[in-house]
Amino acid sequence: MKQAFRLMVGLLVLWASVLHAEVRIVITQGVDSARPIGVVPFKWMGPGTAPENIGGIIAADLRNSGKFNPIDASRMPQQPSAAAEVSPAAWTALGIDAVVVGQVQPGADGSYLVSYQLVDTSGNPGSVLVQNQYKVTGQWLRYAAHTASDEVFEKLTGIKGAFRTRIAYVVQTNGGQFPYELRVADYDGYNQFVVHRSAEPLMSPAWSPDGSKLAYVTFESGRSALVIQTLSNGAIRQVASFPRHNGSPAFSPDGSKLAFALSKTGSLNLYVMDLASGAIRQVTDGRSNNTEPTWFPDSQNLAFTSDQAGRPQIYKMNINGGVAQRLTWEGSQNQDAEVSPDGKFLVMVSSSAGAQHIAKLDLGTNATQVLTDTFLDETPSIAPNGTMVIYSSTQGLGSVLQLVSIDGRFKARLPATDGQVKFPAWSPYL
C-alpha cells in the first residue's frame, strides 16, 4: 500500500493544474442483471460529517464494473459496521451473498484509519472473506476506497480490480488561448488535472507500461510531432517530427520500444523506435497505408490498420519482418484496434451498413461481437484487467466518453461539461 501511494504521489505533479472534475460515470444499461451485493455505509467515528463517503465510493466502483449491483441503503435490512454485527439470513433473504462493512476513524495527527470487511452471508455465513485497513491523509481517502474495491472485486471474481487506474484524454474547450488540453483523471472522472495545454490540436495519448509517461501527437511546431512527456516533472522528449504525418504512438508492453506511423516516404508505414538508443527502423513497406499499431503481449508482434486489400482492415505482423496476416473479415472496414493485455482478443472500430461501432474480435475463435450501439464510435481503449472498454462517440454536437463491458451488457457514459472529449487511453495498473 505504501509503495502504491508513493507512485501515485509522483503522478500528482505540482506543475499540473488541478481542476474540478468535469466527467462522471452515468450508467445507461446493464446494472439490473448484475450480481446483487450489500455495501453498507461506513460508520464515521469522528465529530461532524465524514470527509468522504467511503462506502459510496466502493459501491460505485463495484457498480461501474458491470458485474455487481449494490442495493440502495434504504433497502438494507440492517447497517452494521463490523462482521460480528452482520445477520446473514437477513441479507440472503434479499438474494445477497456478500456484504461489505467498515468504518473510518480520524486520528489526532490529521490522518484517517479506514477499515473494511467483506462478509460471506451464504456459503459460510458470517465468515470474513477479506479485510484490510489503511492509514491515510485526507487527500488519499478516495484512493483507499478504490484499494478496498480492488480487493473486494478480486476476491469475488478472481479478476484483478482496476479501480486505482486512470484515463488520459484530450478535451477541446470552447475558445481561450489554449483550447486543446491533454488531461488525466481517475478512471471515474475524479482528481482530474491538465498534463499539457496547446493552441494546436493534441491527439492519440498512449501510456507507458509503468504509467509514468504519456506519448502523444502535437501540432505546436506547425506540423505533427510525436512527443513523450514524463508526468512527474513535465519533461517533454520529441520522438519524431518528420515531413508529413507523425502519429499513432504505442509503447511496447516491456517498455523498451515505441511503435508509430510515419508518411515521410509517401504512404503511411509503421516504424519502431528503441527508446534507449533512439534508433528507428521501418516495419512495413509498400504502397498501402499502414497505421494505428497496437502491441501483442510479447512486444514482438503488432496488430495494425492497413488498406492493402482496398478498405481498412486489421492485420498482424512481426516487427522483425515477414508477411502480414489479415485478422478481420467481417464488416466493410475495421480499424483502430487495441489488443487485450492477455492477447486473447482485440477491440476495434468496425463499420457495416453505414454504422460505426466498437466490436470485439476473439483471436482464438475469430468470432466478432459488436459491443456498442452509440453513434460514430472511435478510439477504443481496454482496461488493464480486460473487463471494460472506454471509447469516444458523437453525442449531439460533440464528442463524449463512453464505457462498455467486454461482453457488451453494461454501458455507461462520462459526459463532460466544458468541451468535447476524445482519444481516451486507459492506464496500466498504477
UniProtKB/Swiss-Prot annotation:
Family, as annotated: Belongs to the TolB family.
Gene3D superfamilies assigned to the protein according to its UniProt record, in alphabetical order: TolB, C-terminal domain, TolB, N-terminal domain
InterPro entries referenced in this protein's UniProt entry, alphabetically: 6-blade_b-propeller_TolB-like, PD40, Tol-Pal_TolB, TolB_N
Annotated protein name in UniProt: Tol-Pal system protein TolB
GN (gene name): tolB
Function statement: Part of the Tol-Pal system, which plays a role in outer membrane invagination during cell division and is important for maintaining outer membrane integrity. TolB occupies a key intermediary position in the Tol-Pal system because it communicates directly with both membrane-embedded components, Pal in the outer membrane and TolA in the inner membrane.
Compartments, record wording: Periplasm
Subunit text: The Tol-Pal system is composed of five core proteins: the inner membrane proteins TolA, TolQ and TolR, the periplasmic protein TolB and the outer membrane protein Pal. They form a network linking the inner and outer membranes and the peptidoglycan layer.
GO CC field: periplasmic space
Pfam families cross-referenced by the UniProt entry: PD40 (PF07676), TolB_N (PF04052)
UniProt lineage: Bacteria, Pseudomonadati, Pseudomonadota, Gammaproteobacteria, Enterobacterales
Keyword list, A-Z: Cell cycle, Cell division, Periplasm, Signal
GO biological process: cell division; protein import
Superkingdom in the source lineage: Bacteria
Protein species of origin: Edwardsiella ictaluri (strain 93-146)
Annotated disulfide bonds: none
NCBIfam families (alphabetical): propeller_TolB
Signal peptide residue numbers: 1-21
